[in-house]
Amino acid sequence: MSQVKKLSTGKIWCFAVGQFGWSVLAALISSWLVNYYQRDLATQQAGQPIFIPQGLAILGVLTILGAITAFGRIFDAITDPLIASLSDRCKSKDGRRIPFMRAAAVPFALSCILTFWSPVNGVSWVNAAFLFLMLMLFYLFMTMYCTPYNALIPELGSTQQTRKIGRAHV
């Protein structure tokens, strides 16, 4: 009978810390994107710059920012199962999950930072196109990191109790 290897507390905490970075990046996008690109009237009157066209610009229903973020979430929904499938079939010496996480970590952070940078100072469709590109890259790299990360949970330990403990620390 083989012995069940117990997952160390250190490994559990390392796994939990792995969520901190992507949680911060996702929180930045979800909390600040609208505030940064869709300024309210008081903020505009205070002199804060505007970078993308404002108002209901898409079929009189959506703002440019609303359309970009909606498309980003649809793109994310499409890439999630694709990345999951690629990760499941990965035959790397580093395992099935880690290569994706390594490849995505730095571009994920950079795409988040560049989402809040505008190539043109002032209102421009170039800024809207750049925002679209950066947000799609953000969601792609988030998927490349988070999907394999979450797939590590069953691989953390060999018992249900160990998996529960690992998930609870996250």
Regions found by a protein language model. Give the residues of each.
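Membrane-embedded alpha-helical bundles of multi-pass transporters/translocases
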Residues: 2-167
